[in-house]
Structures are given as structure tokens and as C-alpha cells.
Amino acid sequence: MKKKNLITAALPYVNNIPHLGNLVQVLSADAFARYSRMMGIETLYVCGTDEYGTATETKALIEKTTPEELCNKYHAIHKSIYEWFNIKFDIFGRTTNKYHKETVQDLFLKLDKNGYITEKENEQFFCQQDKMFLADRYVTGECPNCGNNTKGDQCENCSNLLVTNELLNPRCIICKNIPIIKKTKHLYIDLPKIKNELEHWIQQIDQNTNWNTNAIKITNAFLRDGLKERTITRDLKWGIPVPKKEYENKVFYVWFDAPIGYISITKEIIKDWESWWKNNEDTNLIQFIGKDNILFHTIMFPSIELGSQENWTMLNKLASSEYLNYENLKFSKSAGTGIFGNDVITTGIPSDVWRFYIYYNRPEKADFQFMWDDFMERINSELIGNFSNLINRVLTFYKKFFGDKIDKIELNENFWQIVNIKYERTINFFKQIELKAALKEILDISRIGNKIFQDKEPWKTKNSTPQTTKELLLNLIYLIRDLSILISPFMPHTSDRIRSFFGKSYEISNKFLGTNLGLTTIQSTEVLFTKIEKQLIDSLKLKYSGRTNMQDEQNKNSINLFSEQICLKTVKIKTIDRNPDAEKLFILKLDDGTPEGKQIVSSIADHYTEEELIGKHIIIVDNLKPAKFRGIRSEGMLIATEDENKNFKIIIVEDFKDNPIPGERVILESDTGKELKSPTKINIDKFLQAQIVAENGELKINGINLILEHSKEKVLSKEIPNGKIY
């Protein structure tokens, strides 16, 4: 039996902020590592950021920075998020560490020496605009397998590993032009030559069922299609240089160097690193990955190890998970959909609550949709109503009626016979990396405790049979101690808080389970969690739905629309006539600062008399398309405020400006000093899309004031301070 557990989580790229789905692997590995330590197994948990390759280079181009600066930025972001989630790495390193180059190059040289490296001239996409060969992630197109839009390394939809040149309708991601095909030379790992050794190793793993069904299925399908030589070099600058003549200007493809990062990162903290990585007899290598990373860990990395012909520690257990998705939407920072690691921190919801929900719904066999309503329901019913409720009610009741001292008693045999079976099941689920099942088993144990407390009704028996009641509660207190141990891989902070109720008189160790050891007093007790309210959930659901971003986009569009397509001007009313065919229509002759003047028709006769308006300055939509009302031509439209009660008032310039000048343009305050366009004619619908409103007496578009162009006076709506502008 192997003595040590070497645990890795897939190295995250440093070109983004991890979202909730990205956290599944590091959290899963963390729970298993904590379980392993709880069982007294020597454990090493290794992870770090994957920093080389096209993903980093392209992101640096987008952010107008260097790859080094980009890596520093995102490594710090990842590290801070993982720390907030209380993930206990033994080391969280980087593939830019000082040992990585020599480790990668050494493995390559061994592969080359052993005849597993071949050289080929091939055709590769070349961008004539950017004058460079395009590595796989510099090209987008349609997957030849499923038709999904994808980058040139691997299809996110069908997980098919791609040959970039096979992409349909390819485009350069930098300039969006169609690249040409040009010849270049690259190095390949000869997978067909390693095939027999690789298949023999995989058959042994398959027989031991140490991988989940999906991992075995994907790997066997890849083998069945036939192994092909796979390129390991790229025409990039940001990467590990290739130590071979004529290839000095190329670097290793990131799939080749990234998994070797597990080894180089270990070297950073352990001098005797070979006792972990070259010790296949005594070390279990257990790797946690997403389903899109399966082939890199079951085919590619093992092929490198086997091809080097050294005694590397080989993958033993593979814990691959499906996708955690968000409210039937894609996680997208730009679209504002989905919750990311830095967003989680700002919700005010404790990290252990998030950990609980992710483990409770860990996508082990199928994709899972994160839903806010389900999040609230599970936390309030399972974590609070079940688990937290048992701890609070038992400890509070015991402390109130029986004091602080915990007596050492003979445990109830019938009760513990049932519970110990549940413990064995929980430990076995942990061992098989069925983390979701392990957590639900723990919650079942908690439910048993709650049922006994409820059925035995200690509040009724505390006076009539105090000793029996006390022993009942003491059995439940020892159960709570065990729950604090079993829950620790999932909720370490909560486990520590429960242990603090007892003065931390026991360790997180399986040796205490089912015993009457380790407890002497109840030093304190408090409610572990507060109920999550629907109001909070509704606000978070809206915030991360993308609708707020859509609103931001609409706001931006409204501002641009007004600046570029709408012209408002001040005019003076010279005369007013009534339309002989429609008494409610006023015909207004206007001085707009031009010799010709303007005429508009407006249905305001029910609101104003002629005497109230003649001589006043108002504001009109100056570039409205001419229209006829009852046969009378109208060359614009006056603007007015209307509130929710249908009160209506024209914007009168004299209300906010002395001696106004006809023809002065009304602009956005943010457009001050800019050269203004003379927009083309528009219809009324286009004007209404600008969504001008009165807020506290000031006319605004999305918080930006409308002002007079030259005098800079704010345009006011004095009589109706809040309403819409029509």
C-alpha cells in the first residue's frame, strides 16, 4: 500500500480572474488534501499559475502590457482569491519559477536522447499583416469536428484536440484578417512510439478503476482513433526556449511545459523532491482537473514521463469534473454574467458557505447549473436548518441546564452502531473522491442527531430524568465533535469555530471518531450562520445577470445618440395662432436665430393660453423631420416634462436663464468644448430613445446634465422637478 498522497490541481492560466466554475478543481483538491491529513497520511498539495504560452501573450497584447507584468498581476489575483477561500496549498507557485526552465529542458533532452522527438516541416498559418507565424491560440475558426467557434488548440464544445490548420474559416485574432499557409519547422513528440507502454499503463489504471467513467471514456476514444505525433514547439517569444540547434528562436508549447510545472513548483519548497516525484512505489499521484484537461493528464504528461525512461511517479487517481455553469448563461466578465472569485468576496457571504454549496453540487458526473434560488434554499435548509441548528440547539441547551463541564460517559451502543456505519461510508466516499456523497453523508449524520433531539424531547425530561437527559445530550455533544472533524475538509473555518466551543481540546484526526475522548468543557457557543434573505439573493441575481451591463450599454448608447444625432435649440415664440380645423393645436412662429425662423405645431391649447407663451423662450428638437398636422407643416417639436400623474409643463428657458438668445444649442455637459456635429433629420422615435429625464429639477441623460452651449447654464424643469421629457 502506498504511503504518501501527492495531490495536484490543474494549473490555472494567469490570463483571467477565476470564476466559480474554475474554483471547482482547487477546492476539490483542497478537500481531499485535508481529508488525507485528517487520516494521518503524509500529504503534499501542489498548485500554481500556468504562465507561459499564447494565452498569456495574447492577453498581454490586449491589456497593452508585457507578459511578465501580466503574470505578476494575475498571479496575485489568483493567490488572494484562493487565500480568501481558505485553500491550504503546501505551495502555490508559478511556472516562471527558477527551476522550471531546467526541468522542462532536461525532460525534453531525455526524450530526444531516447528517440521520442521527431522533426517535421509543416504548414502553419502566417499573418501577412502582423508578419508572424500564428500559434494555435492566435487563430480562431470553426471546429472541423462539431462546427463550434473555437481557438486553434482545443475545442471547448467537444473537447477535441485540434490541429490548427484544420480550422474552418480561420482568422488572426490580432488583426482579424485571413492568414495564409506558410512552411515552417517544428519538433514533435512521437506518441505512436510510446503507444505500447502508454496503453499497458492505462490498462492497469482502468482495471483498478482509479479514474472516473468520463476520463476513461475520453482517453480510450482518443487511443482508439490512433495516436499521432504531436507538436511540442511554437513560434512565440514568451515561453521556455528549446535547447536544440536551429530551434533557438522557438519555445515549448504550453501543453508540454505546464504539467511539468507540478514538478518544478515542488522543487521550490522540497529539497528531496524526488521522494515525491520519483517514488512510484510509495506515492499516490492524485490529480484534480476539469474535463477539458483530461487528455493532457492521461495521455500527454504520462507520455513525457514514460518516454524519459526514468522512475517518475505516475498518475494513480484522476478526479475529473464536469462544468459548473451559471443560471443557464456563460460565465463572462465582459458581459457581466456569472460570479467570479473577486465578486464572491464582495457579497458578504462567508467563504465556508460558498465552499459548502460548491461541494454540495460538485459536478462529478454531469454539468451543474449554479442557481441563486437553489443556493439560498440549500444554505438555509441544509447548512443552517440542519447542520448549524443541531450544534446550536444541543450546546445551548446543555450549557443552560447542565453547565460547562462535559462528563466522560459510556457511549450509547445502539446510537453509535448506527453512526459508526455512517462514518465508514463517509470515509469511503472521501477515499473514492466522491466528495459530494461524503458531504451529504455528513448531513445525514447531522439529521440523525436532530431527529434524536426532537424525538427524545429533552426540554420535557430534564427535570424528571436529569441523568438520562444529560447522557442523551453528551452523546450528541460527542457527535458534534465528530461532525466538526468530518466537516473540516469542506468547511475548515466552521470546523475551527466548533472546536473553539470546546477550547480546541482535540485535533482534526479520525482517531477521535466514535470515541469519548478529547472533550472536557463547553467554553462558549454561538450561532454559526445567519439565514440568507431573499432580498440579498434577488440583488445578487440582478447584479450578475448581465442586465446591469445591458443597462450600462443602453446608457452609453443614449449618450452617444444624443451627442451624435439630436440637436436641441432655444427659440423665442413670436406669434401663436390656432388651427382653424383643430382648436387644440397651436401654430407657433419661432425665432431660432436665423432669418427664416421656424414653425411648429403643438397640441398644448389645453394647457396654456397664447398670452402665457408669446415672448417666452422654449427648447425644440431642431432636426426633427418635417411633418403635417391637419394640413399645417411643423418643423420641430417643443420639449416638456410630464410626471407620473400626467402633469405637463413646457421647459421655459427664462426659468433658469436671464435674457436668453434664440438659436443657442443645448448640449450634454460632457460635450463641453467638443466640436459638435450638425446631425441629419430624425423621427420622433429616435429622439425618445435618448431618454431625457428631469431629476430634482435638472434635465439629464443618465446622470449627465443638459446645458446651454455658450452660457453653460443647466437646463431646468422648475415646475415639475421629476419626470420624463417629451
UniProtKB/Swiss-Prot annotation:
Short sequence motif named 'HIGH' region, residue ranges: 12-22
Binding site for ATP: K333
GO-annotated cellular components: aminoacyl-tRNA synthetase multienzyme complex; cytosol
GO molecular-function term, one example from the UniProt record: ATP binding
Keyword annotations of the record: Aminoacyl-tRNA synthetase, ATP-binding, Cytoplasm, Ligase, Metal-binding, Nucleotide-binding, Protein biosynthesis, RNA-binding, tRNA-binding, Zinc
Cofactor dependence: Zn(2+)
GO biological process per UniProt: methionyl-tRNA aminoacylation
Residues in tRNA-binding domain copies: 562-667
Recorded coiled-coil stretches: none
Motif ('KMSKS' region): 330-334
Record bears the keyword Transcription regulation: no
Top-level class of the enzyme under EC nomenclature: ligase
Pfam families for this protein: Anticodon_3, tRNA-synt_1g, tRNA_bind
Top-level taxon of the source organism: Bacteria
Keyword Plastid on entry: no
Residues that, per the record, bind Zn(2+): C143, C146, C155, C158
Cofactor info, note text: Binds 1 zinc ion per subunit.
UniProt subcellular location: Cytoplasm
Enzyme Commission designation: 6.1.1.10
Catalytic activity: tRNA(Met) + L-methionine + ATP = L-methionyl-tRNA(Met) + AMP + diphosphate
Function text: Is required not only for elongation of protein synthesis but also for the initiation of all mRNA translation through initiator tRNA(fMet) aminoacylation.
Family as reported in the entry's similarity comment: Belongs to the class-I aminoacyl-tRNA synthetase family. MetG type 1 subfamily.
HAMAP family for the chain: Met_tRNA_synth_type1
Subunit structure: Homodimer.
Protein's recorded name: Methionine--tRNA ligase
Organism: Borrelia duttonii (strain Ly)
